[in-house]
Amino acid sequence: MKKVLIANRGEIARRVIRTLKKMNIESVAIYSDADAEAPHVYEADYAFHVGESPSSASYLRQDRILELCKNEKIDAVHPGYGFLSENAGFANKLKEIGVKLIGPSASSMDVMGDKLKAKQAVKAFDVPLVPGVDEAISDIEEAKAIAKEIKYPILIKASAGGGGKGMRLVNAEEEFEEQMQMAQNEARSSFGNDAVFIEKFVEKPRHIEIQVFADQFGDVVHLFERECSIQRRHQKVIEEAPSIVLSPEIRAKMGEAAISVCKACKYEGAGTVEFLMDAELNFYFLEMNTRLQVEHPVTEEITGLDLVEWQIRIARGEKLPKSQDELKINGH
């Protein structure tokens, strides 16, 4: 791997360039009209204009990025986060032209990008799930019966959802019909998919995510947790590592569950498995983010590791740099 294109901008592009320089790999930046003078453009070894200022006319233009990969003999693409980082179609197109995506396969993205598919995949690996259903529901009466069985309060959630969109809390049966219709409408307009499912609402939950890495040989490790319970409108505000509520035993159990999630979708690269935890410290699988996250430096601080370097090493076919026993938490 001699030449890597970063299909992103700003802070994450600069972060990837820093590690590429350290590893003596050539970096290729892309930029829009608005970013012509941006730091990542000057810090990369090469930089190419891909379009006008709106991201839809530049950073999301798969055709231009793929053409650039072919013309500039790019070996691999680092997608960063956002933009095309969890786009299975883009992953497939890169594969077709012989360019390695520094990330998971399209099939892993496809499974984990749909909450229902993800639940069905991890169920076979005995990963704890919030009580509810793991199939799409459209019939109101059937949905009401399920809600009654698992007891209110319940959540109606969009299968393709994220960031709190297409999610509705229902406290009583008389609210159900209206809230379900609102969830479906929001899911349809936000994701083009109105499939919804029902889960028991976990009251006063903690939100704990586990950083994972998997190589091409089927080996998986976890790099411990980040707690992101402090949120506003379902968006994380503070990330803390390690979590103050996890005992070594619970941490190990959550880590094993996260590893099972990776195995359920034949994962490769960096990912984050998110769990909800109730007041009794029971934890439940929520979803998996199939990319490096904005908050990855929090994990780097407590492990002393360069997670972008791990991503690149795995993408070029190396084994995991460390075993689970060699990984330790250092600091807070």
Please report, for each region that a protein language model flagged, where it lies by residue.
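N-terminal beta-alpha lobe that positions the nucleotide/phosphoryl donor
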Residues: 1-273, 277-296, 302, 319
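Peripheral (often C-terminal) accessory segments that flank ATP-dependent C-N-forming ligase machineries
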Residues: 141-143, 278, 312-332
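Active-site-proximal structural scaffolding
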Residues: 301-304, 329
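Polar, glycine-rich mid-to-C-terminal structural blocks
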Residues: 305-312
